[in-house]
Every structure is written in structure tokens, then in C-alpha cells.
């Protein structure tokens, strides 16, 4: 337990250090004003959607239900519930993401008094899929935490920051500010994908059995969404 706590603290500290490096690179590449404001605005909509439907609430609602089923010896049902929650969450978030991308310009219009720059719309299109990816990642990390694995979920944000930092280093070589911003956005999406994929081998190592499932009539599935 002490070793696990030490590794978790190490990963958390490393994540903060790399995150600080990422912010330094952002300031170096784009400055603190000007073009970077378009990225900041473009990220507001996915951030709001995440905070409403895909952030910590889903994991917090899922963990007690999943743990309760495991403690009662209902392991097969626990994984069935986990698979259903993951499937329904993925489809729901994908639908929300798709609608948000379709109506990107009017949604971003609340931040502008005039016309919305096309670059801001492009940036939002690139960033919106992070909502789906982080929603799924939250479920995987919640499962690992329930199974006593804390280090890997703590390391995932480190690699997220590293991937973005690599993208920013490449952006330094780009002369066109709009292209550099798109590189930053794509690096953010790529980092989020890495954050999703990293824990999956450990999930399989814990006999994780996430599959596509639609057992929405299960009372445990309904409890998860009610608790959200």
C-alpha cells in the first residue's frame, strides 16, 4: 500500500511538472494574447459539455455500484453493467458531440460580437471528440481504481501532457499562427487518445471484460445514471 501511494504521488507530481512545461511552451509559441485566445474560446464548449455530462460525475456514480456488485460476488454482472454503462455513455456522448459540432458556429457566437472566425470553428471541431474519449477514459479509470490500481490512471495525464508538449515543439517550427494552433489542437486530441489507450492493457491484465452491451434494463445500470 505504501509503495502504491508513493508511486501515485510520484505520478501526480510528474504530471504537474510536465503540465507546467506544457504551459510554458504554449506561452512561448503563442504568447499570452492574440491567436491563443481563439484556442481558449474553442475549448470552452467541449469543457462545458464535459463538466455537465462526462467529467468526474460518471466515474463517481459508477464506482460504488461496481464495487457493490463485486463485493456480493456478482462479478459477471459487474462487468455486464460496466460494459453497458461504457456503451451507452459512448453513444450518448458521441451524439452530443456530433450535434455540438454541427451547431459549432452559433454556439461559439456567444463569445463574439461579430462573425465567428472560421479558425475558431475548426479548432472546436478538432477538440470536441475529446468529450467522448475522456468519458470512456473516466469509466476505465474508475474500474481500475475499484480494482486497486491507482498508478496507471495517475500516469495517463503525464503522457497526455507529453504528447501535447511534443506537438507544441513541432508548432515552434510552423510560421503560420493558424496552422500552429491547429497543430496544438490535434496534439491535444492525440494526447487524449493516448490517455484512453494507456490503461487498457492493465484492464485486460485484471481480467477486464469490457464489451459492447445494452443491458439497460438492469437496475444497477439505472442506478449509475441516477447517481450522476
Predicted regions and their residues:
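Membrane-embedded alpha-helical bundles of multi-pass transporters/translocases
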Residues: 1-228
Amino acid at each position: 500500500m505504501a509503495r502504491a501511494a508513493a508511486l501515485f504521488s510520484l505520478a501526480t507530481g510528474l504530471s504537474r511538472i510536465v503540465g507546467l512545461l506544457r504551459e510554458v511552451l504554449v506561452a512561448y509559441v503563442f504568447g499570452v494574447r492574440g491567436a491563443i485566445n481563439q484556442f481558449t474560446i474553442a475549448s470552452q464548449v467541449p469543457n462545458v459539455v464535459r463538466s455537465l455530462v462526462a467529467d468526474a460525475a460518471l466515474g463517481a456514480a459508477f464506482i460504488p455500484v461496481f464495487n457493490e456488485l463485486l463485493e456480493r460476488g456478482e462479478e459477471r454482472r459487474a462487468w455486464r453493467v460496466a460494459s453497458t454503462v461504457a456503451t451507452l455513455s459512448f453513444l450518448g456522448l458521441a451524439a452530443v458531440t456530433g450535434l455540438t459540432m454541427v451547431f459549432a458556429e452559433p454556439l461559439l457566437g456567444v463569445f463574439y460580437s461579430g462573425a465567428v472566425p472560421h479558425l475558431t470553428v475548426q479548432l472546436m471541431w478538432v477538440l470536441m471528440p475529446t468529450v467522448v474519449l475522456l468519458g470512456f477514459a473516466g469509466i476505465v479509470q474508475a474500474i481500475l481504481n475499484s480494482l486497486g490500481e491507482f498508478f496507471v490512471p495517475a500516469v495517463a495525464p503525464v503522457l497526455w501532457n507529453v504528447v501535447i508538449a511534443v506537438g507544441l515543439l513541432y508548432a515552434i517550427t510552423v510560421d503560420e499562427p493558424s496552422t500552429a494552433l491547429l497543430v496544438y489542437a490535434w496534439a491535444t486530441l492525440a494526447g487524449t487518445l493516448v490517455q484512453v489507450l494507456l490503461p487498457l492493457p492493465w484492464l485486460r491484465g485484471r481480467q477486464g471484460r469490457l464489451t459492447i452491451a445494452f443491458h439497460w434494463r438492469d437496475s444497477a445500470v439505472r442506478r449509475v445514471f441516477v447517481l450522476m
